[in-house]
């Protein structure tokens, strides 16, 4: 599954659940909260796994708000990053 497919799957879920109108600032507050939980539980793999997934979904929600083409951004990111490997 591509990043854009994951983004679209989250968009579909958001719409069904009524979360598709959640403001980006509110989503970022949730990101902060999830990062706090993650920081407090770094020795608990099950919690880390869960929080990473929560964060991924929140990032995909933000990408939906901005119609971000995540596949293209991924490619651009790594092309730009390659210069640091030389």
Features from the language model and the residues they span:
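Flexible "arm" and connector segments at domain edges
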Residues: 1-52, 56-86
